[in-house]
Amino acid sequence: MQQGGNAERQAGRRTILKAAGASLAVAGLGATATACGGGTGSGDGTVTIRYSWWGAEDRAERINKTIALFEKKYPKIKVKTDFQPYTDFWKKFNTQASGGNPPDVFQNAIGFLRKYDAKNVLLDLGGQVQAGNLSMDGFRAGLEKFGEIDGKLLGVPVGSNSMALVIDKPVYTRAGIKPEQGWTWDDFDEAMTRVRDRTGRAGDSGMYGVMYLYDLYLRQNGKAFFTEDGLGFTEADLTTWWTRAERGVRSGLYADAKKVAQIKPKSALSAELAGSEFTWDNFTVRYTSEGKSEYGLAPIPTTDGKRTGQYLGSLMLSAYKRTEHPKEVAQFIDFMVHDPEVAKIMGYDRGVPTTQAQYDAYRPTDPVNKAIAAYEESLVEAGVLEQITPHPNGADICEAAFLRIAEEMALGSRSVEEAVEQFFTESKTALAG
């Protein structure tokens, strides 16, 4: 959920979104992380905590401004920062965690909660809530529950987003398509055909590797990508999904996979290879930055004309279980999710603010971010939002495998049958670990 999801892994440092969701980055603005485990202290009572995240340089600039506000309010707490691109962040974090040297506080996503809880890395912040150092009041749409696993508060959400179909609005206009809430997958297929036939462009960039989209499709049909301890679908289910995708690539309904690979890190949508792309709603800002067209948000297609299977995803902040400064870390997280000035600085960089105070403090005036807010509000009003799918230990590895193997299938390196077999083999190993 940008959260670190499919699109994020494909985006590069100069093309990634500048004001929304989960973005990629290169190494650091400001101070870098200390080499010792946990935070540090000084003789005058000042403590230093380490804070790491994945994100673009624009995100780093915003975060550094919020840290300056925090240090002004809490002059005895200093914050040292470190950030990398998404994949590099998790490689480094895994190494740090294995060596007992992770940052005191760090950006996180739901796919990693059980993994690092099982490794005794994550602090249960519930104790800090009870101590009055962290408030879980005032969150929108039940988002305060998002970081709870097995009764433990392992993460605090900082921004919400949801899956959407991002469309090239002029292309859809030329094709005569007006997606509406409740449209079906058959309607979607017809729309892709019209885009191809009337504009000469592929209808979609290729949805086959987007794990979170397939999860919605499964949820529409009474299943889910994950259960509490494994996969929630069969090889036959995935064969049907990827066979449909393979046909779409061959017929030109989905963008040429070779061309999509060639233009990375730019998206197929902003590169004008396709008329739409399934991703997190806040990636609209990325496409606006990358491309020359006007982009909008369309509803997720449905199986029965009603259920979309959607939920609000979120980036979150988590803490190291053995941090030397749990109180200060909790105060830092509390400040970052509740302070109105933080919202004004961050905007929708990490999604729509999760607390009502921050949501009210930042009301966008530009059309792109206004559309993102309106889209999420429409989901709440339509009553389509459900509880998020569980993410067992190993979910992050399954997500990466799903994307990689789907791309290999689309490129012709694997047959559908081989791709399905390979995914289930890798997932079985990941989820057993």
Which ranges hold each PLM region?
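Extracytoplasmic/periplasmic substrate-recognition and gating elements
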Residues: 68-73, 175, 243, 250-254, ...
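A structural signal for short loop-to-beta-strand junctions that line the ligand-binding cleft
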Residues: 96, 103-104, 133-171, 306-309, ...
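Hinge/lid segment of periplasmic solute-binding proteins
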Residues: 110-162, 296-298, 367-370
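Glycine-centered hinge/linker elements that transmit conformational signals in sensory
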Residues: 192, 230-258
